[in-house]
Curated annotation (Swiss-Prot):
Protein's name according to its UniProt entry: Glycerol-3-phosphate dehydrogenase [NAD(P)+]
Pathway(s) annotated for this protein in UniProt: Membrane lipid metabolism; glycerophospholipid metabolism
Top-rank lineage group of the source organism: Bacteria
Protein function: Catalyzes the reduction of the glycolytic intermediate dihydroxyacetone phosphate (DHAP) to sn-glycerol 3-phosphate (G3P), the key precursor for phospholipid synthesis.
Key words of the record: Cytoplasm, Lipid biosynthesis, Lipid metabolism, NAD, NADP, Nucleotide-binding, Oxidoreductase, Phospholipid biosynthesis, Phospholipid metabolism
Lineage: Bacteria, Pseudomonadati, Pseudomonadota, Alphaproteobacteria, Rickettsiales
Annotated Gene Ontology cellular component terms: cytosol
Amino acid sequence: MKISILGAGSFGTAIAIALSAHGISVNLWGRDHRNITHINTYRKNLKYLPTYHLPDNIYATSNIDEVLSDNNTCIILTVPTQQLRTICTQIQHKQHMCKNTPMLICSKGIEITSLKFPSEIAEEILQYNPIFILSGPSFAKEIAEHLPCSIVLAGDNKELGESLIEKISNDVLKIIYHQDIIGVQIGAALKNIIAIACGIIAGKNLGNNAVATVITKGMNEIKTLYIAKNHSIDLHTLIGPSCLGDLILTCTTEHSRNMAFGLEIGKGRNINTLIDHNLKLVEGTSTVKPLISLAKKLNVELPICISIYNLLHENISLDKAISNILS
């Protein structure tokens, strides 16, 4: 069995390690030719996860043609949401190589230009490929260390989804199926912004009670947007790994880049400097603008998210933002 992964960052590399450890041949694609050469030569991704060994059944390449073929059981996309449209367009131009191959998308967030979630972007472009979302509480380093996580595969085709789970689920990647593809992505997008808020509260030493308050209110904001976008709610999604599980993980540890980013803000670091240094790594900073635009379009209020938006982009004071978050 062969699986290709588009995106040789931390998460793509970790997924490759977890799959290859269970006998699956993995093609790992990335743009950085030098880093790709290092992976194949030294069996380590020196740019991301440099301390972890990559088994010999992982082949890295910067040539996208090498990873797009009908022999793939599936193709996993781990690129940032703002780059997803470009990658999907590249795939679409080579549709003859991978027509009908399932696409499993790990991107989290909302596209700035269209206000679309990752699955909506992919479905618009890749009309001949089954689209699934793979999401849940899953730090890359823990996956690379073969520590277990519970994640969700969401998509419309239950039979195909469950068949894929049988093939790729293992003792590290414990995967469950959901049909609620939009609900899963709403939780994945908002949790990063809520984690920034939790980091700010922790950085200001306002206590665990206040952090718990933010998580609780944040869960309500996920529910609010979920109902407005989906016109219904699936409780299994809301309290499952992709919403509640990912929210708890992202909001309660400094290993979360979004929580750590908020922590530095709470400690008084300059916000613009932090954004400049972390823009590509902290998903919440690129999600908050399109999220607020989407909330306005759907006529819903998200107090925590608008507070973070105003803090990052409208220059309100930190104390005012904290007051709004906790009010």
